[in-house]
Amino acid sequence: MKKEIVLTVFLIAIVASLFAQKSEVFNPSNKAIRGYDPVAYFTEGKAVKGNESLTYHWKDADWYFSSTQNLNSFSKNPDKYVPQYGGYCAYGLSEGHKAPTDPDAWTIVDGKLYLNYSKDIRTKWREGEKERIDKADKIWPGLKDKE
């Protein structure tokens, strides 16, 4: 009887921890970058809303694209275009926590896309961008699968 109780408690703890884990990709309503096209940041230099008929499922999220060309580019090399830290706020990560993002609060640094919570936060992040990237790069591996 005691073994069954211990086993039951153990199984409940495992199931609860699975539900407590957050996706590695920030994807409200299962839309990565809230439905914006990740490739467009690089090719058009601006945030562009994706088309619901042009999607690609990757890392438990649906990625939206504004053109077939962008969809094809992404499908060949997603890592080239995805935002750093799974699309969570770069500033927040540098402070040790996950935070949601605004697709219009973005920056490309050394060929990598970074998103932030808001344009005001992006301004703060840009003031010490290199140091913040170094901090967030160290923190991200421990936070990416956490609540």
PLM region spans:
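Charged, low-complexity intrinsically disordered segments
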Residues: 21-147
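Bacterial Sec-dependent N-terminal signal peptides
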Residues: 1-22
